[in-house]
């Protein structure tokens, strides 16, 4: 009887093994660059063509290989980095399995050119589909150059899963970003289709992070330095305002190796838990140094996940390290503002004097002033310079007193008096006007006619709760409306209608804004320019990863569109062949709608509530916001009385 189990041929096992190691061009670049760093290279140049499908070339200035070593490097499980079982648990290198080069060679046409410092000439090896075709001598500098051409030429099924050249190039750029941040002392150059995407010179960590993630983030980075026993945590953490909608900017490293470990990421998120909104992620570059025997990095094919011997201790150390920095950073050092009662005219006048730097006298009882009748110029008395002793805390406190007072118009002098007084010598003009009346609470609007009004407009407004919920009455029912969710639903339906027509209404910016993106974000933006234009965003490439933002959706406020754009790029970057733009367009419109309305607490006037209810009546309204949260809840009189045990 014939056996059903058989030994697979070598060429097939090589392809299976390559499937674990070589997922896309970025996987090839990762293996080759890590080998270059392990070889002690101080400069790495990565070049790709057609997103890496046509060419991936990595050049380094490392120690190089002899002829015999170069030939052995193409054999499976051949490595110079470990020799015994003990070595496997005391790793100090990025690679150790001896699988990278043979796996890459089995699915490409590969050329290795290498030379050591004690050799006069180098060695060049050409392999195709995992088989060595040619070995010869060559002239070159010390180091190694590996060229990978026609990736997946013999595995067409895998080739079908590759995405566009822009997307694959973005993944290579993101991979190099991770490695460049981990080794700021090494120079990195990345070229895509002959164009230099970035060149990172050797620098300190902060300069390297700014180079890779954008200069705009540099002023928001704070250093981490923490040690507990044999565990050390260092790096940089960014202010909460730099947060992202996904964890793509969590750059975490164990002994110099980039990882995506759940324990490490959870510790960082716990440290930020009181600083970020739900669903937001910080920007960090955190390095953990621990004895190699305390961590196992050989638990995942990509080595992105690790296993700690003392998981709880590592988690707490990372959380404490990040928390200790966040507790000392400027966004917590704000002067406390004491609660004040409703300000009076006297309070407001005193507050204005403080905000003017104490250069003007505090208000006194108004005295009548004779009218100006002379045609002669009016000389102004010399202002006496005074040293202001008003602290910033005092300024912050009294600003609150001005909240209910509108600035009064300042009447100008008649023309014959204007030429004789200069701005440098004149005291501030303070006309003796009648006291500014304190704004009284608005009276309730008249009850709308239920027959003429829609459902929401017919509600009787009781007031607001916690500056977040509108309390209304309809008959004997108590209706509670989440004002943010309601605003969001209205904005979403408006955007959806515009998008269905052709595109979202865009507002051109008077002064285009310069925006810096990461390499992956820039690649996503370049690929989806047309879709972003339909959403109302107008971009123009400015060079490298810098873009000019020239237009935004009309519904977005001036302070929200930067965060919105980064969130949308994060969403677009997650698209795959099975998930097209049309599948997420409503999610993107919902995100724009969410960013276009006021978040948090806000006191609404009766006029604003009436306008909101009118918009809700005119909208094809749903009982939930675009994210699924309810817009309103209704309590019947019976339910309320049951709460108070009346029935």
UniProtKB/Swiss-Prot annotation:
Keyword Magnesium among UniProt keywords: no
Listed InterPro entries: DNA_mismatch_repair_CS, DNA_mismatch_repair_MutL, DNA_mismatch_S5_2-like, HATPase_C_sf, MutL/Mlh/PMS, MutL/Mlh/Pms-like, MutL_C, MutL_C_dimsub
Polar residues composition bias: residue spans: 413-423
Highest rank taxon of the organism: Bacteria
Cellular component aspect of the GO annotation: mismatch repair complex
Entry annotated with the keyword DNA repair: yes
Key words, A-Z: DNA damage, DNA repair
SMART domains from the UniProt entry: DNA_mis_repair, MutL_C
Alphabetical list of Gene3D superfamilies matching this protein: 3.30.230.10, Histidine kinase-like ATPase, C-terminal domain, MutL, C-terminal domain, dimerisation subdomain, MutL, C-terminal domain, regulatory subdomain
Gene Ontology MF: a single term: ATP-dependent DNA damage sensor activity
Gene Ontology biological process terms, A to Z: mismatch repair
Job of this protein: This protein is involved in the repair of mismatches in DNA. It is required for dam-dependent methyl-directed DNA mismatch repair. May act as a 'molecular matchmaker', a protein that promotes the formation of a stable complex between two or more DNA-binding proteins in an ATP-dependent manner without itself being part of a final effector complex.
Family: Belongs to the DNA mismatch repair MutL/HexB family.
PANTHER family noted in UniProt: DNA MISMATCH REPAIR PROTEIN MLH, PMS, MUTL, DNA MISMATCH REPAIR PROTEIN MLH1
Descriptive protein name: DNA mismatch repair protein MutL
Organism: Citrifermentans bemidjiense (strain ATCC BAA-1014 / DSM 16622 / JCM 12645 / Bem) (Geobacter bemidjiensis)
